[in-house]
């Protein structure tokens, strides 16, 4: 009986039906089987891990399209991540040894890589979150790294993307970042800034030069972060050209105004996109701003189309009778998944960063349990599958 042929046929049949799934709770890359397409386990690369030579790592990962676990690349000597250029899906999982994931709490962590210049995660399409994950894609303290505007757009299609003060390669707009990783405020926004790469925070701000500060706000089109004004003396806050905010502070509302005694005027007349809200549904949450009793028609229409507007201690009808027939489309604005990178969220996570109390008891509690890891095999009886069965039957009869 031709046992070698039978074994070869079984091997091909197995790979055809089930695929090249490899299991390693905390992967030692040099021991990973060849030709893995799916890895069930946690990948750690950097000085804190025992890494084989780069050529071996590249060879072991070149066919990987899906990782069920997490990826941590920290303190590495990589200049790019092209070795993961075929990776399409990362799904967070706590199976096996999860110590590597819990050290950062993210699905994809790329941090403290002093030589890293480019990502080249060109095939990445989907990031699947769970309530255990702090962030989906987390980029921090990679001083030489820049991402393209296209990559930024891809990553902003996901929830829980976090990359404060990221550098942009060959930008077509004026992206403003701070080397000291502070929040933007009334003093440090450069003239002509179109994109803020972190949150705008006016916390206890005194003696604001209103005209000069407003002139800097006029050019801002996007904010990668939130807007927080707390116990400030500012009287007017206008963003005539701001059209998109991606919330890097998920424990705060997108726009948070609290205890500002002089604030009487707010404008968001062009804000039309909030790809990620965070844990609060409110697009604007205001509390204890005694002079802020009215919003313009354009601001009311835009904010109402994005999500709830909450004014504590003021009539909830602050925008009532000031909106036209604009129909709210919150789902569309929140998911932002029209194409490219997609994110599935099982349960929202939390962020340890909080600037102040927002006067609420916290985000609504969600008791949904983590979905257990499962696999679904698609036994499609196509011609190739039948071909192998017929040969197997012929050998044994």
Curated annotation (Swiss-Prot):
Matching Pfam families: Recep_L_domain
SUPFAM superfamilies, alphabetized: L domain-like
InterPro entries on file: Rcpt_L-dom, Rcpt_L-dom_sf, SPS2_domain
UniProt protein name: Protein irld-34
Gene of this entry: irld-34
């Amino acid at each position: 009986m031709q046992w070698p042929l039978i074994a070869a046929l079984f091997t091909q049949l197995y790979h055809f039906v089930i695929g090249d799934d490899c299991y390693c709770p905390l992967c030692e890359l040099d021991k990973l089987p060849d030709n893995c397409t799916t890895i069930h386990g946690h990948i750690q690369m950097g000085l804190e891990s025992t890494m084989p030579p780069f050529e071996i790592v590249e060879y072991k990962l070149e066919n990987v399209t899906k990782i069920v676990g997490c990826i941590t690349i920290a303190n590495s000597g990589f200049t790019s991540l092209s070795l993961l250029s075929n990776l399409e899906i990362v799904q967070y999982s706590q199976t096996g040894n999860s110590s590597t994931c819990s050290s950062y709490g993210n699905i994809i962590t790329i941090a403290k890589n002093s030589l890293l210049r480019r990502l080249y995660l060109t095939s990445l399409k989907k990031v699947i979150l769970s309530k255990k994950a702090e962030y989906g894609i987390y980029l921090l303290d990679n001083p030489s790294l820049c991402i393209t505007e296209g990559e930024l757009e891809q990553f902003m299609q996901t929830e829980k993307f976090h990359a404060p003060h990221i550098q942009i390669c060959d930008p077509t707009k004026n992206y403003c970042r701070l080397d000291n990783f502070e929040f933007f405020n009334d003093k440090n926004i450069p003239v002509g800034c179109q994109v803020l790469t972190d949150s705008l925070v006016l916390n206890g701000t005194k003696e604001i030069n209103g005209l000069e500060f407003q002139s800097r706000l006029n050019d801002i089109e996007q904010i990668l972060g939130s807007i927080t004004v707390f116990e400030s003396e500012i009287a007017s806050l206008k963003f005539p050209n701001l059209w998109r905010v991606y919330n890097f502070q998920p424990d705060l509302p997108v726009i948070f105004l609290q205890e500002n005694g002089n604030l009487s005027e707010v404008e968001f007349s062009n804000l039309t996109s909030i790809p990620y809200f965070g844990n609060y549904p409110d697009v604007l949450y205001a509390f204890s701003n005694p002079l802020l009793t009215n919003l313009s028609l354009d601001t009311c229409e835009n904010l109402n189309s994005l999500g709830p507007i909450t004014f504590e201690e003021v009539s909830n009808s602050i925008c009532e009778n000031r909106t036209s027939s604009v129909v709210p489309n919150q789902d569309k604005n929140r998911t932002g998944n029209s194409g490219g990178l997609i994110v599935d969220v099982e349960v929202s996570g939390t962020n340890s960063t909080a600037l102040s109390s927002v006067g609420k008891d916290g985000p609504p509690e969600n008791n949904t349990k983590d979905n257990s890891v499962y696999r679904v095999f698609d036994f499609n009886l196509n011609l190739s599958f039948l071909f192998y069965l017929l040969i197997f039957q012929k050998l044994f009869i």
